[in-house]
Amino acid sequence: MATTQAQIQRPIANFSPSLWGDQFIKNDPGAKAAEKHCKAVEELKKEVMNMITAAGSNLVEAMNLIDTLERLGISYHFEKEIDQKLKHFFNLNKDYSDESYDLYTVSLHFRLFRQHGHRISSDIFGRWIDESGKFKEGLKTDGKGLLSLYEASYLRTRGETILDDALEFATATLNSIAPHLESPLSKQVVHALIQPLHYGNPRIEAHNFISIYEENQDKNEFLLRFAKLDYNLLQMLHKEELNEVSRWWKELDLVSKLPYARDRVVECFFWAMGVYHEPQYSRARIMLTKTITMTSIIDDTYDAYGVIEELDIFTEAIERWNMEEMKKLPEYIQPFYKALLELYEQFEEELAEEGRSYAAHYAIESLKELVRSYHVEAKWFIQGYLPPFEEYLKNALITCTYCYHTTTSLLGVESAVEEDFEWLANKPKMLVAGLLICRVIDDIATYEVEKERGQSATGIESYMRDNNATIEEAVAKFFEIATDAWKDINEECLMPSPYSRDVLMRILNLERIIDVTYKGNEDGYTQPEKVLKPHIIALFVDPIKM
C-alpha cells in the first residue's frame, strides 16, 4: 500500500510567524522627504570635507576626526580621502613610545590602522607593561584609555599575546569601573562590553554612537546634524528596498504554500544590509536578500519537514538544475523549485548584460554544494548517526550557508570579477575562518532546540563524545575556535593582499552579522523577537529625531 501524506511522519519545527506582516509593503518611504534630505546632506558634505582638509598633517586631530566620521556612520562619503590620510600617517612610522601619546591615542591609532589593513605592530603597547609582564595597575583609573585599548585588542592576530592580555585586562577592569564612570563614557563602556565595535554591524553601531555623541560636550554640531540626516536618508533607501523585496516575497506566496518554513524576509534583508549598507550596493542588497530567503526555505525543508525519499529527489533536482525536473518533485515543493530557477534566470539575464554571467554560475554551483551537504545531514538524522567531529565539521562548514552567502553577496557587486569568485570557490583561509565562526556560534545557539527536536548529529554532541567532554567544555572549545578564526580574519584583512578589499569586507561584514544575530547564545534569526526586532525597528522603522 502506498504511503499517504497523512501517514508520513515529519519533523515539524513549528516556527513562529513573521513579526512584521505587511508592514514594509504598506510603508511609504517618502520621495519628497528623501530629496530634501539629499540636498542637506550634500551641503554638509562640503563642510566636513573642509574639516578633513583643515586637519592637514596634524596626526592626533586627523585621526580623531576619522574615528568620529567612521563611528557616526558617515565615513563612506570620504573613503578616498580617509584612505589617503591613513596611508600617509602610517608611512610616517611615528614613534609611539613618545610619552605625549597616551593609551587612548595609541590604541585608537592602532585600531584605525589595522581596520584599514595597515600592518602596525602590537609592540607599541609595550610601554604599558610592568616588570612582571602585566599591564600597569595605574591604568585602572583611565576609563577612556582602557575602552580604547579594549576596542583595539579585537583587531589581534594569532601569536599577539600582548593583545590577548590587553583584552583580558581591559575587559575585567571596565566591568569593575563601569558603574562609577560618568555618562556618556559609561554608556559607551556598557555597550562595548556587550558588543565590541569590530564585531558589530556598522549601521547598528552608528545608530548607537549618534546618541552617545549627542551627549558629548565637545561634539561638533555639523557632524551630528550630518550623521542624523545621512542616517535617515539611508533608512529611506533601505525602506524602498525592503518594500521591493517584501512585495516580491508576497507575490511568490511561498508562506502559504510552504507553511512549515520560516517567514523571515525582513530578517534576511537585515542580513543583506549588514553586508553592505552604502547606496551603491542597492542592487546587491536586493539580490542577496532574495538568495538568503530562498536558502532559508531549503534549510527548513531538509531540517524540519522533508522525509528522506523526498529529499533524495529534491537533491537530484537541484543537481540537474532543469525545469523539467519539477514534475518529479513532491507537489508541495514544486512552486519553490520553479521560483528558484526563475530567480536565477533573472540574475543570469541581468548579469549577462554587464558581461558577468559567470557570477550566476558560481552561485548555482555553490548552492548545489550546499544542498548536497544538507542531504548528508538529513541522512545522518534519519539513520540516527552521530559522526566523528572531524567528519561532522567538514560537512557542517558548508551547511552553515556562509560559503553560499559569501558567493551570492558578490552577485550585485560590479567590481567583483571572475577571479574573486574562483578564489571563494577554492575555500581560502579567510573564508574558512568565516565558516568556522558561523558554524560553531550557530551550534552553540541552537544546541538545546535541536536536541529537543531529536537532532542527534549536532556539533556539540559530536565533540562531547569524541573528547569525553561536558557541555560546558564543548561550548568553551567552540568559543575558542571562533576566537582563533577571528584572528585569522584579521590577519587576512591586512595588506599586502592580492584580493580586493571590497570582497574582503563582504566576508568580514557577514561575520559581524553572525555575531549580532547570535548574541547571547540566542538564535536571533529563528526567534527574532528578542535579538533582532529592536535592531530592525531602529534601522528600518524609526528615523532619528533631528
UniProtKB/Swiss-Prot annotation:
Naturally occurring in which organism (per UniProt): Salvia miltiorrhiza (Chinese sage)
Any Pfam family hit: Terpene_synth_C
Stored SUPFAM superfamilies: Terpenoid cyclases/Protein prenyltransferases, Terpenoid synthases
Database matches in InterPro entries: Isoprenoid_synthase_dom_sf, Terpene_cyclase-like_1_C, Terpene_cyclase_plant_C1, Terpene_synth_N, Terpene_synth_N_sf, Terpene_synthase-like, Terpene_synthase_metal-bd, Terpenoid_cyclase/PrenylTrfase
Record note on domains: The Asp-Asp-Xaa-Xaa-Asp/Glu (DDXXD/E) motif is important for the catalytic activity, presumably through binding to Mg(2+).
Protein name, per record: (-)-5-epieremophilene synthase STPS1
Induction summary: Induced by ethylene.
Similarity remark: Belongs to the terpene synthase family. Tpsa subfamily.
Entry keyword set: Lyase, Magnesium, Metal-binding
Gene Ontology molecular function terms on file: magnesium ion binding; terpene synthase activity
Major enzyme class: lyase
Positions occupied by motif DDXXD motif: 299-303
Pathway: Secondary metabolite biosynthesis; terpenoid biosynthesis
Residues reported to bind Mg(2+) 3: 442, 446, 450
Gene3D superfamilies: Farnesyl Diphosphate Synthase (1.10.600.10), Terpene synthase, N-terminal domain (1.50.10.130)
Positions with a binding annotation for Mg(2+) 2: 299, 303
The protein's Enzyme Commission number: 4.2.3.199
Sequence positions that bind Mg(2+) 1: 299, 303
GO biological process, one term: sesquiterpenoid biosynthetic process
Function: Sesquiterpene synthase that catalyzes the conversion of farnesyl diphosphate to (-)-5-epi-eremophilene.
Quaternary organization: Monomer.
